[in-house]
């Protein structure tokens, strides 16, 4: 933001135009990149001191600000150790601390938990929740739909550069309507999948059907009402079932409905 001129359209951050008021926008935002911007030979504190000087923060205020963000991301005990001794989760915490040095009102985070183990991911989630509680607006990009569901007040589903849907997690999921019935056919019945899908589409209460290899995802108004007819279609076509499941709509179902594919395929 503010580095490259947009090829079209307009954007505002906190009511500020990113082209006409670029300096004011830069003063209001922080950024945590996807690729770690860590120098392994510097300590955590030295990283923050360098950034504080680049932001022209006076030394007396910088020291207090550095201590504050180190405490916020729980890195005080490692602040004076070189970054090469940090674990992956600690390096990500340092990235977040760097993004917080200018005391931003809006923090942009690009894939904040990419490549982290489960424990480290959960810790980063907790730090993001703390930022929200402090009144910081966090805008994050993620391919982890459970992460978006857990952390976000509003979600935009973007496909090929276009916003396909936007709303709260509950709004997006309830907007699909009904439940999802998933049928997994025996691998030897791949040639029957499309014919079965067409037959199921004609059943009462079936809203939509999508297929992926030997799996059918069927959106229905009521699983209890639709399942007998669906299973009847399976039997009539001599298909062998390996697994049957149904669940309330999840964000991956929302993504599938708006893009035609599941996010794990990308």
Sequence positions of predicted segments:
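ABC transporter nucleotide-binding domains
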Residues: 1-165
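ABC transporter nucleotide-binding domain
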Residues: 126-221
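Short beta->alpha junction loops/turns
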Residues: 18, 186-189, 223, 248
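A short linear hydrophobic-aromatic micro-motif
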Residues: 74, 205-209, 240-245
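A generic structural signal for secondary-structure junctions
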Residues: 14, 30, 56, 95, ...
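Solvent-exposed alpha-helical segments within well-ordered globular domains of core cellular machineries
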Residues: 64-67, 126, 170, 174, ...
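C-terminal coupling/interaction segments
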Residues: 222-266
